[in-house]
Amino acid sequence: TSSCFRQAAEEYGYKAQNFIIYPIKVNQMRPVVEEIISHGKKFNLGLEAGSKPELHAVIAINSDSDSLIICNGYKDESYIELALLAQKMGKRIFLVVEKMNELKLIAKMAKQLNVMPNIGIRIKLASSGSGKWEDSGGDASKFGLSSSELLEALDFLESKGLKDCLKLIHFHIGSQVTKIRRIKTALREASQFYVQLHAMGFKVEFVDIGGGLGVDYD
């Protein structure tokens, strides 16, 4: 996969860094994750946690302070606190907001712990994938912020002095996508969000692309 991406990057003149993120929910067995981390170092491999227990596992396994840790899933105060404490210890960790109340909790906990959090926002795109799981992405998804909610989040960040903390935008167009055209459409839409956010003074550094190509497992 990495060699294919490298070839495509050369063909289309893509110059930016790219990172591979492994969600440990796929397989949490320590020997498996350690092997993936070891092999993936040269490919900028990071890990994704979808819960507080998974984040505990990621912190314990991943000793590389340069690799990315992405925090998704439902976030209560204890999950957010663990992520922020890990950041204070030098971990390169990002909390991806899926609901407005999560953003307010992050701001509250960050103030208590005296840390400037690395914040990501999951955006609901109008575009969606295709196939069996298309409703898990796009504006039909129950996860992520709509355009109006995104504006509310941006106003909130600015009011709390956290404008510079928005480092990442995330979108998910669904699993088992059967039409490459849907992915292209979603990427164009996401790039517009990226450009507009920069124009508004939010210096987003990462675009986290979620979803997967259709694979015939039968």
PLM regions and their residue ranges:
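Low-complexity, highly charged intrinsically disordered N-terminal segments
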Residues: 1-13, 23
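A short, charged/proline- and glycine-enriched loop
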Residues: 15-17
